[in-house]
Amino acid sequence: MVYHHRGAYLMAMGTVASWALPMHPSYLYTVPMFHCNGWGHAWTMTLMAGTVICLRHFSPEKFFEQAGKHNITHFGGAPIIMNMLASAPDGIKPNFDHTVKAMTAGAPPPASVLEAMAKYGL
């Protein structure tokens, strides 16, 4: 895959528009940088003066730990990531005092996964 400046710009601007992204978001990476959202969201967060939090390895425990520590507002993840978060033990799931917005790509997550995530503010 070849990335180009025009594509990176369009991806960044499109994400700002489609996510109604505010200034200074706090974004938690759960996807590899070589994925479209992985590379594109680096530019998006820079555009919006955001904070980027990276995970070396994904696990629901690490996700929820870092999400709470850094007060994340946004994250991106494949449906399998969302399923892992929805299926995590209740004891590690925080109740966020704000909605954490997620962007996914590939096949849409099942409705049951989206419902489970919504219970915890995701």
Task: Please report, for each region that a protein language model flagged, where it lies by residue.
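Gly/Ser/Thr-rich phosphate-binding loop
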Residues: 47, 69-77, 86-122
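Conserved AMP-binding/adenylation subdomain of ANL enzymes
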Residues: 5, 9-26, 34-73, 88
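Conserved adenylation A10 loop of the ANL superfamily
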Residues: 1
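Conserved proline-anchored active-site loop of SAM-dependent methyltransferases
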Residues: 32, 78
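Thr-Gly-centered strand-to-loop micro-motif
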Residues: 29-30, 54-55, 103-105
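Alpha-helix capping/helix-boundary segments
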Residues: 59, 80-82, 109
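Nucleotide donor/acceptor-binding cores
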Residues: 25, 31, 100
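Hydrophobic alpha-helical segments typical of transmembrane helices
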Residues: 11, 29, 41, 62-63, ...
